[in-house]
Each structure stands twice: as C-alpha cells, then as structure tokens.
Amino acid sequence: MNMKKRLIGTGLVLATGILLTACGQPNSDTSTFSSTFSANPTTFNYLLDYYADNTSVITNLVDGLLENDSYGNLTPALAEDWSVSADGLTYTYKLRKDAKWYTADGEEYAPVKAQDFVTGIKYAADNKGQAMDLIQNSIKGLNDYVTGATNDFTTVGVKALDDYTVEYTLTRPEPYWNSKTTNSILFPVNEEFLKSKDKEFGTLTPNSILYNGPYLLKDFTSKSSIEYVKNPHYYDHDKVTIEKVKLAYFDGSDQEMTIRNFESGAYTLAGVYPNSSSYAKTKEKYQDNIVYSLQDKTSWYFNFNVNRKAYNHTAKTTDEQKKSTQTAILNKNFRQAINFGIDRTAYSAQSNGEEAASKTLRNTLVPPTFVQIGDKTFGEVTASKLVNYGSEWSGINLADAQDGYFNKEKAQAKFAEAKKEL
C-alpha cells in the first residue's frame, strides 16, 4: 500500500492525536477513506511553501526523487536508482521512465523529466521559496545566484544530464542529502505548464498544478472539504488500495462530533479527545481500535522575544515593569531557569490528557533522527554538545516522546543565580 507518507499527518508536537480506526467496523467501505482536517490549506505552490498544513495535501499529489516508507527509511519514488561520488559531492539520480504528469482531470500532460527538477529549483530561487535555506548553501553556486552575485543559473550545481538523469553538485559532503530530497522545494515542475499558469500556479484550485503522485485533487472547498481520487495512471498504482479520500473540515468546537460520525460510518478514522466527557466510554467500547498518531517533521514551539517592543497582551503596564521584564529576559540564567522549570508533560496533558501527554513532546526543533552523523543520530550528537553550556546540560535526553529538560532542582539553581545577577 503506497500510502506510507500520505493521508495522515497529525503527529505534531503538542498536537499528536489519539485516533479511532475503523478496522473491522461493520459496513465500512474499504475503497474510501473518510476523516477530518483541521488546518486549512493556504496554497498548493509546493515549491515556494513549506508549511505542514499545505504539504500534507501536496504529499498525496506530487512525488519527489525519494520518499520515506512506514519505518522512515528512504525508498525510491521518481528516482529508480542513484549514486554518490567518492568525495560525497555529487549525487546522480536515474529517473523512472514511466512517471508522467497528469492534469486534474487525469489527462496525460508530459513525461516527468530531469529538466523538471532544474526548473523547480530555479523557480524557487527566483521567487524566494520559503524553504530555500534548506538547500541554498548546500548546492554549489546556489547561494551566489540567490544573493545576486551571479544571474547565470547555469553555474548552479543542478543539471539535467539527459532526459532521465539529474545531477546535484554540493558545496560540501552531506551524508543526509538524500533525506532533503523528500522536501517539496526539491520537487519537479513542468516548465511549459508553469509558464502557462504564471501567477496562478499553485493557487487553491485543482487545475493550478500538475500531478505525478498517487492521487488527483478532485475538490477543495476552504474550511469545508478536501477530496482526492486515485490516479489510475500512477506508476505505482497497484500499491494504492484506497480509491477515494474524503476529508471534512473540523474546527474542534464539538469534540463529540467525530465519534458520532465514526459510529454512523461517516468516518473511517476519527480523532478522540482524552479530556472530553465521552472519552472513557469510547475507550472502553473501542479499545482495540484506538491508536496514537505518529510524530512527523513538524514542531510547534515557543521562545523568548528578546527584543520586545510591545506589551499589549501582558500585565506589564509601567515603564519600570517593562524594563525589568526586558532585563530578566536578556539574562542567560533566567532563561535557563524558565527552560528547566516548564513541565511540558503537564502542559501537554491539558489538551491531550495524561495518557497521551508525553507522546506529543519533542526536544529539538527537528526530529532527533533528522540526519545520521556517523553511527549517531542528530539528537545524540546535539545532546553530547550541550555540556558546553554548563554541567547542568550534561546527560540530557533529546529523544522524542519525553521531556528532556524539566528539572525542578536545576530550575531553582539557575533562578538563584539569575537573582544574584539581577
């Protein structure tokens, strides 16, 4: 089933849900997946945008070179094979020849070719793609092009060697480069179609983009519904077992609604809320069918505004209070005291319940397994470096699904130091 990276992307930090699935539910239609969405897409321009609300739609419609399987392993998508030079600077991808572009109506438009990847990066660079920082200093010559040091895109290290071979030359070895190819800024786009749409490319209509993925967007109505239909011409269509996807907008105001629609057969999958009045009854009735959604690459976080100019939404009203607040925030020990003093698990439990509270937590901006450095993950390497901030940072666990920072004793010690300095 080729839906390993598609359809459900609710595992956000402080937003991981408990999901009720219709496995074995009587009269369930196995050819149609029905559920809800709560984040309204704002654009389908996958080359310029990187927000999860939008990419959760695009990932069902457009394929890149590689994708992640259900275990997070990188597997071929549009690239059927690839190689890396001995110095780690050149990545060469051989494209599958049966991948095509299709219109929203399912009509074949053109083959997917290597030049489509070159066009995609140039378009993103010319239009200040929001995820440009992911690749700007990675691809040779791209930074010079983006900053205006040169206007010659042929100096940039992305080349179509032939119709089905695309090559990237990097500024330095990046053992994790392949993982970057799953980001939409590195997805392909057909140049002829792009020019024909001009500023209409990626607007919120099905015909604003072309499709090379497992689904076609049948309909999108803002804060109402999203509908996909299986792309019958998709190169891997035999592995796509769900014919239709129907998502209804859910604003969270009526938490019992998802259960009612699940029980009526309207939803294949529904979110359940541990703090709702019906949760205990729902859990007892559907215990074997309740699962936790997985965390994904998206993180929600809050941080200090160290250069605050406005105090409109605080209790600080006098100039003295505002000055004291700013002075405290600029104190390193005060900030560390707050960091060690926030019980993130308790905070999460307010919306996710005690049972799911820790499952939502992340301790790094990106997943701790984001990249592999030798035999260690990004999280493990980062944790080993934290001791440079002081001995209190040693031994901190940056793995997902637990609070690596909360420590009452450390918070009190740091606060005491801050009081002396303030």
Predicted feature residues:
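Surface-exposed binding/hinge segments that line
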Residues: 116, 123-193
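N-terminal lobe/hinge region of extracytoplasmic solute-binding protein
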Residues: 36-86
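C-terminal motif of bacterial Sec signal peptides marking the signal peptidase cleavage site
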Residues: 19-22
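Bacterial lipoprotein signal-peptidase II cleavage site
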Residues: 24-31
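Bacterial Sec-dependent N-terminal signal peptides
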Residues: 1-9
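Extracytoplasmic/periplasmic ligand-capture domains
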Residues: 97-107, 111-127, 216-351, 372-422
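Gly/Pro-rich hinge or "lid" segments in bacterial periplasmic/extracellular proteins
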Residues: 170-246, 257
